């Protein structure tokens, strides 16, 4: 059962202004995209890439992009190198470009450390043998060697310490060998000198023994002679 149109309702509809409402339009790129049927087969084709701190357009237009950890770290490093006055007012891209123009940055912190380029490391290893010669290692004390090895690699430091220990032991052995040889030569010279003195003393003893026998024989002849020989006995004594 249909009711007749009310005059008040018709008047309200005629007076209603539809132009004051905005018309919602669908984005054109959404229609020209991949069909709905193909979305199920490629689930990752419609997923946008994750935004980074270097792409401010990916963030909403009403707010500024939030700085990431890497951006904050680079800005802090730049502030330490150039001072806070020069860093203020720089964008992240300008800060990174300025850091790259400054050269390699020494990074020490939770993100890692800068150990130098391979060329610098090779040059350091080449300079170490020139700086630490055998004579320098032997004459250098342990404290001085540890001070010189600061900043050197652990393997290189262990190798130099082992080399110094080997040179020290070799020097001690050579010194002991030289000392023993010197003592041996001294003892041999002393033995030869004492042997010569012994031979001289033996010759002197033999000479004195012969003189003793000669004097004893003369004494026996004088005592066994005639009675007149007693007056001349004192001449031979």
From Swiss-Prot:
**A molecular-function term among this protein's GO annotations:** DNA-binding transcription factor activity
Where it sits in the cell: the answer is: Cytoplasm; Nucleus
Region (Basic motif) spans which residues? 159-185
> Which superkingdom is the protein from?
Eukaryota
Consequence of gene disruption: Photoreceptor precursors in retina produce only cones that primarily express S-opsin.
Coiled-coil features, chain-numbered ranges = none
Q: Which residues form the bZIP domain?
A: 159-222
Which processes are annotated in GO (biological process)? Answer: positive regulation of gene expression; positive regulation of transcription by RNA polymerase II; regulation of DNA-templated transcription; retinal rod cell development
Expression by tissue, per the entry, reads: Expressed in the retina (at protein level).
Q: Which cysteines are joined by disulfide bonds?
A: none
Q: Main site of residence?
A: cytoplasm
Note the CDD domains from the entry: bZIP_Maf_large (cd14718)
| InterPro entries for this protein | bZIP (IPR004827), bZIP_Maf (IPR004826), bZIP_sf (IPR046347), Maf_TF_N (IPR013592), TF_DNA-bd_sf (IPR008917), Transcription_factor_Maf_fam (IPR024874)
Q: Where is this region: Leucine-zipper?
A: 187-208
Q: Where is this region: Disordered?
A: 26-64
Q: Where is this region: Minimal transactivation domain (MTD)?
A: 30-93
Keywords for this protein: Activator, Cytoplasm, Developmental protein, DNA-binding, Isopeptide bond, Nucleus, Transcription, Transcription regulation, Ubl conjugation
Name one cellular component (GO) term. cytosol
Glycyl lysine isopeptide (Lys-Gly) (interchain with G-Cter in SUMO) crosslink - at what positions?
20, 24
What does UniProt say on post-translational modification here?
Answer: Disumoylated at Lys-20. Sumoylation modulates the transcriptional activity of NRL on RHO and NR2E3 promoters, and is required for normal rod differentiation. Phosphorylated.
Question: What does this gene product do?
Answer: Acts as a transcriptional activator which regulates the expression of several rod-specific genes, including RHO and PDE6B. Also functions as a transcriptional coactivator, stimulating transcription mediated by the transcription factor CRX and NR2E3. Binds to the rhodopsin promoter in a sequence-specific manner.
Indicate the quaternary assembly.
Interacts with FIZ1; this interaction represses transactivation. Interacts (via the leucine-zipper domain) with CRX.
- Its family? Belongs to the bZIP family.
Domain notes per entry? The minimal transactivation domain (MTD) is conserved across the MAF family, it may activate transcription by recruiting TBP and associated factors at the promoters of target genes.
Name of this chain's protein: Neural retina-specific leucine zipper protein
Query: What organism is listed for this UniProt entry?
Result: Mus musculus (Mouse)
């Amino acid at each position: 059962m249909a009711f007749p149109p009310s005059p008040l309702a018709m008047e309200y509809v005629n007076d209603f202004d539809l132009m004051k409402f905005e018309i919602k339009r669908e984005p054109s790129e959404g229609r020209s995209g991949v069909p709905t049927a193909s979305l199920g087969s490629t689930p990752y084709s419609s997923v946008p890439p994750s935004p980074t701190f270097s792409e401010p357009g990916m963030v909403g237009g009403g707010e500024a992009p939030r700085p990431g950890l890497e951006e904050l770290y680079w800005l802090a490093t730049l502030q330490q190198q150039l001072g806070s006055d020069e860093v203020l007012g720089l964008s992240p891209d300008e800060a990174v470009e300025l850091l790259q123009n400054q050269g390699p940055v020494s990074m020490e912190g939770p993100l890692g450390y800068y150990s130098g380029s391979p060329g610098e490391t090779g040059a350091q290893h080449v300079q170490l043998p020139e700086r630490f010669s055998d004579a320098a290692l032997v004459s250098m004390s342990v404290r001085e060697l540890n001070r010189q090895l600061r900043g050197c690699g652990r393997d290189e430091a262990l190798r130099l310490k082992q080399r110094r220990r080997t040179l020290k032991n070799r020097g001690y052995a050579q010194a002991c060998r030289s000392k023993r040889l010197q003592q041996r030569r001294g003892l041999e010279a002393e033995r030869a000198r004492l042997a010569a003195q012994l031979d001289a003393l033996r010759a002197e003893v033999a000479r004195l023994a012969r003189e003793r026998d000669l004097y004893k024989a003369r004494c026996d002849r004088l005592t066994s002679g005639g009675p007149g020989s007693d007056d001349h006995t004192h001449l031979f004594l």
